[in-house]
A protein has these predicted regions:
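N-terminal signal peptide c-region/cleavage motif recognized by signal peptidases
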Residues: 13-15
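Extracytoplasmic small-molecule ligand-binding "clamshell" domains
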Residues: 20-97, 157
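Periplasmic-binding protein-like
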Residues: 29-31, 108-111, 188-225, 247-248
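Bilobed "Venus flytrap"/periplasmic-binding protein-like clamshell domains
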Residues: 33, 42-54, 116-150, 156, ...
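Extended ligand-binding regions for polar small-molecule ligands
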Residues: 46-59, 139, 210-244
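Short, hydrophobic alpha-helical packing/hinge segments within bilobed ligand-binding/sensory domains
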Residues: 52, 73-77, 164-167, 173, ...
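Acidic, polar ligand-binding/catalytic clefts
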Residues: 53, 65-127, 140-141, 199-202
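Ligand-binding clefts/hinges and TM-proximal coupling segments of bilobed small-molecule sensing domains
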Residues: 62-65, 140-156, 195-196, 228-248
Length: 248
């Protein structure tokens, strides 16, 4: 009996320590609806936000502050600070060794999308190099282009996706490189006609994750991943998913 009590005490201490350490991390995100964004009251919300709150519950971590900022700023802090969690971050081949990861939040298609009325023909990705392309600065859409040898002088970077969409609709760029789901959500929220837009190329299908600064301990990331895995298998997650991605 004493041995069992001792083991239980050690287990409780370990869980408490993990929750305390998870509470020392800085949680950063961006306006990227429906995964993460601010509601009309200015509070962070979205699928990834609610998922994170469920992970905190599973790991006995008190709710933490979530800071919404431009993606490029959050990505910079992730590379420079020792205790940052940035989400939802696409886990690309180029990014994989730079950070530690807890996955998945979800999956997304990164596409080149333009106005349907424009007579663009892409038979191979290199054909897109003839056109001016917009992207969110430091976003996966921009990084995939650079990784594929695109001239950064032909990539017009915006701080936020609404700015990038405005560049497309005003004719400043021919294509946008971005997450298809997020862009179509933005198009709907701005009451634009989805039929005016066309996907000309799919760059990649990526997994969205929580990215941790590399100095964060493996044990802490594992603790977070364990909590995330439990949440993803729960009925609570099914409800969250149906809320933001309702089945037709």
């Amino acid at each position: 009996m004493k041995k069992w009590i001792g083991f239980a005490a050690l287990l409780f201490a370990a869980i408490t320590q993990a929750s305390q350490e998870l509470g020392k991390l800085h949680y950063l995100s961006e306006e990227y609806k429906p995964y993460n964004y601010t509601d009309s009251a200015g509070n962070p919300t979205g699928l990834a936000i609610e998922l994170l709150h469920q992970v905190w519950k599973k790991t006995n971590t008190p709710p933490q502050t979530i800071t919404i900022m431009p993606w490029a700023r959050g990505y910079y802090l992730l590379t420079q600070k020792p205790n940052v969690v940035l989400f939802a971050t696409a886990r690309t081949e180029a990014r994989d060794p730079l950070f530690k990861w807890a996955c998945p939040i979800g999956y997304a298609e990164i596409v080149l999308i333009g106005l349907a009325k424009n007579p663009l023909t892409l038979t191979k990705l290199e054909d897109a190099q003839q056109h001016t392309i917009g992207a969110v600065r430091a976003d996966v859409g921009e990084q995939l282009l650079l990784n594929n040898g695109f001239d950064e002088q032909k990539i017009m970077a915006a701080n936020r996706l609404p700015q990038a969409l405005k560049m497309l609709t005003s004719g400043r760029v021919d294509l946008l490189s971005t997450n298809k789901t997020t862009l179509m959500d933005l198009i709907a929220s701005q009451q634009l006609d989805p039929a005016q837009f066309k996907v000309f190329w799919m760059l990649s299908s990526e997994q969205f994750c929580f990215a941790f600064s590399h100095p964060v301990s493996d044990e802490l990331v594992k603790e977070f991943q364990n909590g995330l895995t439990q949440v993803l298998a729960s009925s609570e997650f099914q409800q969250i998913q149906h809320k933001y991605f309702p089945v037709p």
